[in-house]
Amino acid sequence: MFSFCSGLWRRNWAIFGLHFGIMIYLYSVGADDMGITELAVLRWLHIIAMVYWLGGEWGVFNTSTHVINRKLSMEERRRHMQTAYHIDILARIGIISLLPLGLHMGHLWGVQPYGGNFLVAVWVLAAAWLTLCISAYFYRETDTGIQLTLWDERVRFVLIPVMVIASISSLLGHGPFNVGPMQYWFSIKILLYSVTLMIGLKLRFIMREWTTLFRVLAEGPNQEAENQLEKSLALGKKLAYFYWVTIASVAFFGATKAI
């Protein structure tokens, strides 16, 4: 009975989320921008990426509670950890996809002046980053997976300062993005997106630590490993609240373009 109710609850929320997403999409497109256009398709993909990003992070947040539950068997805890990884990969794909989609749409809106070869390079590099991220997911419980995850993190170490500098420089009027009446929103959105990458990077550290700690726990009970697991998850949950607020802010500026 509980399983049925739980499934019904998840289905109702999924239906609500779908209706809400369609409503936001129609509101943001407007009556004068209907039809299958390049911008409309990119916006549709952007909405899907945003939904999986935010929804995926919520799923990981709830599933992770069972990972540190000492009352559960190691097998069950490991199963919950695997579920968290399965959900998280969708969020990772979403957050990476938002970058090329946003830069491409920004060019069509006239707030990001670089098109042509620049956009081609952005899409190629984003595809390479996605390949790296997905490969790390498939090899997540091996040494190869850990190394791939480290390379994924190195990409973020390079990308984050580049985006922070570019967005702040643009807000100060020095480019590379255009600013003016009703154009500041794009640079603000890029800055907030870079903040989410910072938080996400720390959450990546936490999930990578899970793999290491579960290797220790697989050898037998270990109080120190259990304590560290609980400590890291407690920090992750605190970060998650700020993460959601920042994600919502990114969506707000993207939808309203109010500044």
Specify the residue positions occupied by each region the protein language model found.
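Short, strongly hydrophobic alpha-helical membrane anchors
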Residues: 2-5, 13-41
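Membrane-protein biogenesis/insertion across secretory and organellar systems
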Residues: 8, 12-15, 106-111
